[in-house]
């Protein structure tokens, strides 16, 4: 059982206290329904060796260090491989380097210089396995709650939390829709890699705004296309082999959407093309990756002939 009592204590006296008090029952109900692979992933978690970090770095990377002999490291590596595929990272766990599909540290190095997370209560929507949550703590956040309904990501987070039990980061296997309306309790809300999966992007922006305190900041990272304020791509079918991609706006169009949703001080802080060095297959993620989704003769296009992935980070404030 996951004990959320520390989370309840952390949020006592905040606008999120009432919500926090009901989370244990909500989580227990969700876990009772389970998932077909949960037992296998739980076995991998149970196989993790008992280790105590002597040095923790969440500022420049995710690195845990301690005295660890070769035999223990082999057990650790096997257990962590049992939680494959690993999408977001990398993680260096007592000398075991989890070489994830994404170099998420590169994205964080593009995003983090534009933010001040010191002392902030943070919500990460679509948090994946929680890599960014740990880095947010490294950047000074007071607490970080991630929501993502994917059970494997939940278990991968538990693996890291096993070695960092006292840090104020929590992963809830919920969708944004499972959160109550008008929470208005977070100083900063992240939505990275989610918007293009939403059939109604404006509703997504409004739901994110509802999670923020007045004056709170939204960090929106999503796929974009070149063009002016009128340019929005809606794929006929797939985009980079993904079925569930709906709206890819230009940066000016996305900025307009955010203003229409009620955000102020809207600005783009980064635009970057995703490369096959940043997203690729590895031993820890053996399935197809970006190189399989691009036109083999022209990497400026996807296999469908659409513009290759380009990502923007837009920040805005709730007035």
From Swiss-Prot:
A matching Pfam family: Methyltransf_9
SUPFAM superfamilies the record matches: S-adenosyl-L-methionine-dependent methyltransferases
Protein name per Swiss-Prot or TrEMBL: tRNA U34 carboxymethyltransferase
GO biological process: tRNA wobble uridine modification
One MF term in the entry's GO annotations: methyltransferase activity
InterPro entries registered for this protein in UniProt: CmoB (IPR010017), Mo5U34_MeTrfas-like (IPR027555), SAM-dependent_MTases_sf (IPR029063)
Primary role: Catalyzes carboxymethyl transfer from carboxy-S-adenosyl-L-methionine (Cx-SAM) to 5-hydroxyuridine (ho5U) to form 5-carboxymethoxyuridine (cmo5U) at position 34 in tRNAs.
List of residues binding carboxy-S-adenosyl-L-methionine: 88, 102, 107, 126, 176-177, 192, 196, 311
Keywords carried by this UniProt record: Transferase, tRNA processing
Domain of life: Bacteria
Keyword Cell inner membrane attached: no
Name of the top EC class for this enzyme: transferase
Catalyzed chemical reaction(s): carboxy-S-adenosyl-L-methionine + 5-hydroxyuridine(34) in tRNA = 5-carboxymethoxyuridine(34) in tRNA + S-adenosyl-L-homocysteine + H(+)
Residues of the signal peptide: none
HAMAP family in the cross-refs: tRNA_carboxymethyltr_CmoB
Gene this protein is translated from: cmoB
Keyword tRNA processing applies: yes
Family according to the record: Belongs to the class I-like SAM-binding methyltransferase superfamily. CmoB family.
Subunit and partners: Homotetramer.
Matching CDD domains: AdoMet_MTases (cd02440)
EC number: 2.5.1.-
NCBIfam families from the UniProt entry: PRK15068.1 (NF011650), tRNA 5-methoxyuridine(34)/uridine 5-oxyacetic acid(34) synthase CmoB (TIGR00452)
């Amino acid at each position: 059982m996951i004990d959320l009592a520390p989370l309840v204590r952390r949020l006592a006296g905040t606008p999120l206290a009432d919500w926090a008090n009901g989370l244990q029952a909500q989580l227990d109900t969700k876990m009772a329904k389970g998932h077909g692979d949960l037992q296998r992933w739980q076995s991998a978690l149970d196989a993790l060796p008992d280790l105590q970090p002597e040095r923790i770095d969440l500022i420049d990377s995710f690195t845990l260090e301690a005295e660890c002999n070769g035999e223990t490291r082999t057990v650790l590596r096997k257990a962590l491989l049992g939680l494959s595929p690993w999408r977001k990272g990398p993680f260096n766990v007592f000398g075991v380097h989890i070489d994830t599909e994404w170099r998420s540290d590169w994205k964080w190095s593009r995003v983090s210089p534009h933010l001040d997370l010191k002392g902030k209560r943070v919500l990460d929507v679509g948090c994946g396995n929680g890599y960014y949550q740990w880095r947010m703590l490294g950047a000074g956040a007071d607490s970080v709650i991630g929501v993502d309904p994917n059970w494997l990501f939940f278990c991968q987070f538990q693996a890291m939390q096993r070695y960092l039990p006292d840090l104020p980061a929590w992963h809830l296997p919920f969708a944004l829709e499972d959160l109550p309306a008008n929470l208005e309790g977070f100083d900063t809300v992240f939505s990275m890699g989610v918007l293009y999966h939403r059939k109604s992007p404006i509703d997504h922006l409004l739901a994110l705004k509802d999670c923020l305190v007045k004056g709170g900041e939204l960090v929106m990272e999503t796929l974009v296309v070149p063009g002016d304020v009128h340019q929005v791509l809606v794929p006929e079918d797939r985009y980079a082999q993904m079925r569930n991609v709906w709206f890819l706006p230009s940066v000016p169009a996305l900025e307009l959407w955010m203003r229409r949703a009620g955000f102020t001080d809207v600005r783009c802080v980064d635009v970057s093309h995703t490369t096959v060095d940043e997203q690729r297959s590895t031993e820890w993620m053996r399935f197809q990756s970006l190189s399989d989704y691009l036109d083999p003769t022209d990497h400026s296009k996807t296999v469908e002939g659409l513009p290759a992935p380009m990502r923007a980070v837009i920040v805005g404030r709730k007035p």
